[in-house]
Amino acid sequence: MLKKSLVIIISALIISSFAACTGNAGQSSSSSSSASSVTSGSSVSADSSSSGNSSSSGSEEVTFSGYEKGIIDTTNLFTKRDLTQTADTSSAKTLEVSDGQTLKITEEGVYVIKGTAKNCTIRVEADDTAKVQLVLDGVSITNDSTPAIYVVSADKCFVTTGADSTLSVTGAFTADGDTNTDAVIFSKDDLVLNGTAALTINSAQGNGVTGKDDVKVTGGTYNITSALDSIEANDSIAIYDGTFTINSSKDGLHSENSDDDTKGYVYIHGGTFTINAKSDAVQATTYLQVDGGTFKLTAAEGFEATSIQINDGTIEISASDDGINGTQKSNSVGTPSIEINGGKLTIVMGQGDTDAIDCNGNITVNGGTIDITAQMSSFDYDGTATYNGGTIIINGEEVNSIPQPQMMGGGMGGQAPNAQNGNGFGGNGFAR
């Protein structure tokens, strides 16, 4: 009886093992077949049953909160997946770009993009709940008039640079129907740029990156040369980290929403920024909040927004108009303001009618170090100036109050009553 029982048990185990091996072999064959069918054409319509999904490459759980007294609510700004610099490619599909072709991605998933091509567009046209992650693995795309990456629809698209890649558009952009696709990377929905390698973007006649929703950058290295704005967004630009070398014939970072005055803000948590811009290095129509980072900005104006708050960071600005400018760019924000709570600011102004820190409203200094070199105006404001702490140095001399604004006028042979006499001090109200 015992022998018979043992025989039955052993037989069952053998049958079970054989079935498992057969099943695994079938799965392997199916996966291989799916991958080859995806890479063999110019148009990709991904099969969601075999592609990666949002949970495979980092949770969308919110883990970030910025400066608690900030002018921007940063509570839900970055998710864990936004901040994850490498993609989970265990279930990813590998696609290769080719000349004159469009890679069309229609399903949520992780896609590793390889190869070199001319006039090739990676087109994401997925469901509005889909999260699509493009992993650039040594990609080089050069187009005449169309975006290299075009996100038509998705809940969110991640562009993750896994190996050094280059995207270029050499001519004027051609519209896609009613959509003015004016950037090398153009997205109608939320866009996240991250990664561990360098992405070079060249735009001969347009923007480098355009997002019609939110644009977030959480890591990676970005070398952007553009005829217009280097990074532009309708709703917001939020930067957690990254290294940026930007040469722009317009603005370096630009956020503006003409339909909703509560949007159009820029938030910077950290990163390293070298920006050369003919207009503004960083412009927001509503709020600009800087919580950290290292900045070397050369532009007509360094920072411009309706309300500006600087809480930390090492900031060097060389400007030909205003170093930091708080001006009424949005009626919803209220009175323009500049608030400096920390950080180290070095502002060097060019010759002419220039202001190092200029606000059409109120200036408040609570902390930090402000070192200004200005032949004309160090501070200019239409409202009030409040000095509660920190260090202010003007042309090498430390002062213990914010100078009064310069009064223009005085005629051909005279000088304005409160003119700064070339020393950067604002009239009679400064204290040394």
What are the residue ranges of the model-derived segments?
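A composition-driven surface/loop motif
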Residues: L2-R432
